[in-house]
């Protein structure tokens, strides 16, 4: 029995694809290993969204290629980088035995059979035809939380983004399929389901001809044993009144939303082809703020082509004024195949980094003040582990791996997956400390 390992890079959407590949291979009799040094076959599920992600994926491929001097026999690249650079990857990285695009990963077992016959395999170009419905998953996350992908692809056509070319047009899954999978995940022990897609708020527009996310959330919340539902990748132009009401009134939906805004200035938003404007963004924020204790996570992009000092200043003031609880700031990455690649003037890297640092400094203080306001209050915490004599976990305000943690001092015997109500005693810029 051959050992197969997988390294999943990039976003949670990739994680789900990796989990499906593992299930396919296990069913075919392969042995799944977590230690790359024990693998006969290693799959790297790559990210190819921006420059840093591409570099990381390529570095991993080169690094893992060195294992071929030892036990490793075959190295396969899947995911976004593979879809985007297909033939080029095979040509430039001789370590690779196969390259599989985003729409072709269900063929993983057949591809391995082919490379074992001595062939080099290239499969790509079918992003729009991906059919992975009904494929089981072997969870790579701890069993108490799981990602639930509700749609594939994107049709938003932002001028800086290559995703529609890599992942295809927006395709919602059928509600009954999502609900079946959600029930299975909860049966396996998931207490938190994290809804993901390139754009979760557009769910249903293609299949049902209307926004169906509120209805989907309502149905998922009926599952016994499920405690938290978390919403990531919401798109500002599709946050409806109905969605806000569902989040507000549904006890299982955590009062947290991840809603990438990208910028505040109308001219920049127009160049980005964001299909929204400052006024609409203000309205969405105000709608969300009507939900008590709502935590808004957002991301902004600095150094977009033509971003003037005045436009950057506008963004700076916007962040100061809106006081988002969670903010990520990215520097614009010039990607071939996007409309913004040809826009002028392109901003110098040094300016982009300076702007990023400026915004993060502002946000650091906002985040600290927000955390400080929690001292003396009680927060429910999902325990995730124990390290250096203290437990750590997440509150409703924290998504896994992207937000902070809550450290919990306790003499009680706790285990990962337990929910406890901690009294917050101390605050840092991104983390909290509590007692239970």
Swiss-Prot record:
List the SUPFAM superfamilies. Answer: Radical SAM enzymes
Record-annotated residues binding [4Fe-4S] cluster 1?
Answer: 11, 47, 80
Q: Please give the InterPro entries that the UniProt record associates with this protein.
A: Elp3/MiaA/NifB-like_rSAM, Methylthiotransferase, Methylthiotransferase_CS, Methylthiotransferase_N, Methylthiotransferase_N_sf, NA-bd_OB-fold, Ribosomal_uS12_MeSTrfase_RimO, rSAM
Q: Which residues form the MTTase N-terminal domain?
A: 2-117
Keywords in alphabetical order, please: 4Fe-4S, Cytoplasm, Iron, Iron-sulfur, Metal-binding, S-adenosyl-L-methionine, Transferase
* MF terms in GO: 4 iron, 4 sulfur cluster binding; aspartic acid methylthiotransferase activity; metal ion binding; protein methylthiotransferase activity
An example of a Gene Ontology cellular component annotation for this protein is:
cytosol
Keyword Iron-sulfur on this protein? yes
GO biological process: any one?
A: tRNA modification
**What range(s) does the TRAM domain occupy?**
372-436
Protein's UniProt keywords contain Transferase: yes
Residues involved in [4Fe-4S] cluster 2 binding:
154, 158, 161
Location of this chain's protein in the cell = Cytoplasm
Secretion signal, residue range per the UniProt entry: none
Its Enzyme Commission number(s) read 2.8.4.4
As its record notes, the protein acts as a catalyst of: L-aspartate(89)-[ribosomal protein uS12]-hydrogen + (sulfur carrier)-SH + AH2 + 2 S-adenosyl-L-methionine = 3-methylsulfanyl-L-aspartate(89)-[ribosomal protein uS12]-hydrogen + (sulfur carrier)-H + 5'-deoxyadenosine + L-methionine + A + S-adenosyl-L-homocysteine + 2 H(+)
Cofactor comment in the record?
A: Binds 2 [4Fe-4S] clusters. One cluster is coordinated with 3 cysteines and an exchangeable S-adenosyl-L-methionine.
Question: What cofactor requirement does the entry state?
Answer: [4Fe-4S] cluster
Q: Which Pfam families match?
A: Radical_SAM, TRAM_2, UPF0004
Q: Which residues form the Radical SAM core domain?
A: 140-369
According to its UniProt record, this protein's enzyme class is transferase
Q: Give the similarity note.
A: Belongs to the methylthiotransferase family. RimO subfamily.
Family annotation (HAMAP family):
MTTase_RimO
Q: What role does it play? A: Catalyzes the methylthiolation of an aspartic acid residue of ribosomal protein uS12.
Name of this protein: Ribosomal protein uS12 methylthiotransferase RimO
């Amino acid at each position: 029995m051959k050992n197969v390992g997988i390294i999943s890079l990039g976003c949670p959407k990739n994680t789900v694809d990796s989990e499906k590949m593992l299930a396919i291979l296990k069913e075919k009799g392969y042995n799944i290993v977590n230690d790359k040094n024990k693998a006969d076959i290693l799959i790297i599920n790559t990210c190819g969204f921006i420059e840093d992600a591409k570099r990381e994926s390529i570095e991993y491929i080169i690094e893992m290629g060195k294992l071929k001097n030892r036990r490793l026999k075959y190295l396969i690249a899947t995911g976004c980088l593979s879809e985007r650079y297909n033939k080029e990857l095979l040509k430039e990285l001789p370590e690779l035995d196969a390259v599989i695009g985003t729409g072709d990963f269900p063929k993983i077992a057949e591809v391995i059979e082919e490379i074992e016959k001595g062939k080099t395999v290239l499969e790509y170009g079918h992003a729009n035809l991906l059919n992975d419905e009904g494929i089981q998953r072997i969870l790579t996350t701890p069993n108490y939380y799981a990602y639930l992908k509700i749609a594939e692809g994107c049709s938003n056509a932002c001028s800086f983004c290559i995703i529609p070319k890599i992942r295809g047009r927006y395709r919602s899954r059928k509600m009954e399929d999502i609900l079946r999978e959600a029930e299975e995940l909860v049966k396996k022990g998931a207490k938190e389901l994290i809804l993901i897609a390139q754009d979760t708020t557009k769910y249903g527009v293609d299949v049902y001809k209307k926004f169906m996310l509120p209805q989907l959330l309502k149905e998922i919340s009926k599952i016994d044993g499920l405690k938290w539902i978390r919403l990531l990748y919401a798109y500002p132009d599709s946050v409806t009144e109905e969605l806000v009401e569902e989040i507000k009134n549904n006890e299982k939906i955590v009062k947290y939303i991840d809603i990438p805004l990208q910028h505040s200035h109308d001219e920049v938003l127009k160049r980005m082809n964001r299909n929204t404007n400052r006024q609409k963004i203000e309205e969405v924020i105000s709608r969300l703020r009507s939900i008590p204790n709502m935590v808004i996570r957002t991301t902004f992009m600095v150094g977009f082509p033509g971003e003037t000092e005045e436009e950057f200043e506008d963004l700076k003031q916007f962040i100061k004024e809106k006081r988002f609880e969670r903010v990520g700031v990215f520097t614009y990455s010039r990607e071939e195949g996007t409309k913004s690649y040809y826009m002028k003037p392109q901003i110098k890297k040094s300016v982009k980094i300076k702007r990023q640092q400026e915004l993060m400094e502002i946000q650091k203080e906002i985040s600290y003040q927000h955390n400080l306001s929690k001292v003396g209050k009680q927060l429910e915490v999902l325990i995730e582990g124990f390290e250096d004599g203290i437990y750590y976990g997440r509150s409703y305000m924290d998504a896994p791996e992207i937000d902070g943690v809550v450290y919990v001092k306790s003499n009680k015997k706790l285990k990962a997956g337990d929910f406890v109500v901690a009294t917050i005693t101390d605050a840092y810029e991104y983390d909290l400390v509590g007692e239970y």
